[in-house]
Each structure stands twice: as structure tokens, then as C-alpha cells.
Amino acid sequence: MTRTDQDSWDLASSVGATATMVAAARALASTGERPIINDPFAAPLVRAVGLDFFRRLVDGEVAPADPQRGERDLQLETDSIAVRTRFFDDFFTGAARDGIRQSVILAAGLDARAYRLDWPAGAVVYEVDQPKVVEFKTNTMAALDARPAAQLRTVSIDLREDWPEALRANGFDVTQATSWSAEGLLMYLPPEAQDRLFDNITALSAPGSRLATEYHPDATGTTMAQRAQEFNDRWARVGCDIDLSGLFFDGERSNVVEYLTGRGWRVSARPRRDLFDDYGLAYPEDDETAQFPNIVAVSAELG
């Protein structure tokens, strides 16, 4: 599966299929013995997409060809997504607790935070994603009779287009502090689009705005290509018959911490392995191909 600069997708193809994969992992993580997240919408959304493998996965019908290694890979993927999800959940709830009432979820996919988090009165949540993705989730959540816990405003646009203008046209207030998330997103953008994304966020952000994202410090073209293949191979061992390789854009990328710092953000960064410890999950130190072992969780505040 090869990316192009102007490609598009729904939730059953290309980058969209990875959103369905992540939702499936959230569904599994929500039903574990000691779950650190709770996403009751993940499994119904995955079933609605209709990709057979992920439907069978959330329904407990997948048996890896290599049970020992496949089950371990699946647990790793599930735990990794659980930790990532909890980090961003805590980010948004913390920002809301501190008085921020405007939030933007970039590349929202099947994210259900607007429905499942405990938002305060007056909170407005913007979800930005491809038109087909937004339409599908909006219709599916309505069919599930789900009600947002905040005022939800969807913005149907590709992040490689003029999404800031689309956001403002949907009521975004540049004078209000905002909490922003770019979760599981950067590797799917060309390097120059990553920089442009942060430039746009900065331009739209009032002082006191916050941002959460994640990045790979050694994200060179070769490394990203190798990791994309490892990512695909792990899911193949679990039994996935969908080609997830070739989805990451190659090329030298800016260091996210340095880039944001240079634009006025106060940045803190923590390796994902530290988050595993925070949330009481075991990090697989002996696994050389653990999912993005050097991934760094970033939180920042402007001004």
C-alpha cells in the first residue's frame, strides 16, 4: 500500500483502516482484567465499519496462527494503545479541569472522547478528519443513539488542506485557550506537512493553549519504513490479512520538542515506556521490535 500526497480514504482503507485497528485495540483494552481505559463505543464502531478481521477480533473470534507469539504481539498492541489513549484522555480532562473549554481533536478517526469523557458545562469539542470518516462516525453514533457529552462540532477536511479556515468557519474562537491533540498522526503526514501542522496550531492558539502529541526521535526515512514493516508484520502474526505497510511518509523530520519550543511552547516529553509504568502495565523490555520503542509522548503549553 503506497501513499501519495493527495490520497484519501475511508475507515476500511489505507490510513483509515489503522483508525479501525486502533479502535479495535481500544475495545480489547476496555474489557481486560484491569482496564486503564473505558471506551464503550469502540467495539460497536469497529463492527459498523465491517472489516472482517477487526470485527472478529473485537468479538473474540481470532486465533493467531502462532498462538504464543501472536498472542504476545496482540497484548503488546493492545497495551500500547491503552497507554496512548489514557495519556490523551488525561490530557483533555486535565485541561478542562484547569478551565479550558475549547478542544480540537485532529485526525479524530473513531475517537469517541466527545461522547465518553466527563466534559464540563460549556465545553466545545471539534473533530477534524476526512469527509468520509466524519460522515461515517456521525451516522453510526446517531444509529447507536449516542449523545455527545460536550458540544460537538465536526470539521470535514483533509489536514493537508486549509483546515484552519474550515475550523474557524465552524465557530472556532482564536481568542480562547484551546487543548489540541495530534494522536497517532505525525507519521502519516509528509515531513513538511508536520511542520505546517504545528505552525497552524500555533497561529490558532491563544496564550495558555495546550497541545498533546507523540513522535519518534529517530524518525528518518529508512527507520520509518522499517518500522512500518514491523508494524505490519506484528499484525500479520495476529492474523490480520490487511496490508498496513507503506502508510508512513519517509523523509527527515523536525524534532518535535525543538520545533515547538522554538515557537513559544513550553514542552515536556516522556518516553512511552515511562507511561507504561505510570499506568501499571509491564513494558516488554526484551522485545526488540516492540511498537515504536523510542516513541515520546509530548505535552506543551503556549506562552
Swiss-Prot record:
The keyword Methyltransferase applies. The keyword Methyltransferase applies. S-adenosyl-L-methionine binds at residues 129, 158-159. Its EC number is 2.1.1.-. It is an enzyme of class 2 (transferase). Keywords: Methyltransferase, S-adenosyl-L-methionine, Transferase. It holds the Pfam family LCM. Signal peptide: none annotated. It comes from the Bacteria. GO terms for biological process: methylation. One of its GO terms (molecular function) is methyltransferase activity. Exhibits S-adenosyl-L-methionine-dependent methyltransferase activity. Belongs to the UPF0677 family. This is Putative S-adenosyl-L-methionine-dependent methyltransferase MAV_4435.
